[in-house]
Amino acid sequence: MLFRSVALIETNLDDINAEILGHFVEKAFAAGALDVFHTPIQMKKNRPGVLLTVLCASTDADKFSELLLRETSAFGVRR
């Protein structure tokens, strides 16, 4: 059985529109992400937001963290 180490990278966003999300998903898959998805969340003061998640090889975690910061309005990522 083959086991592969993967990284989970996430960020919460409250000011992103669907077009930017779609663009990011396409770029991340083109760059080699294993999976990319966004989940609706409720943020503080009951504001709607999005949890953006990228699964990638552990060796690519820095690359996808930088992509998230460059292509979205995120101030940081959770790894």
Please report, for each region that a protein language model flagged, where it lies by residue.
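Short amphipathic alpha-helices in soluble, non-transmembrane regions
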Residues: F24-V25, F64-T72
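Short, hydrophobic beta-strand segments
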Residues: A7-T11, P48-V54
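Short, ordered loop/turn segments at secondary-structure junctions
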Residues: P40-M43
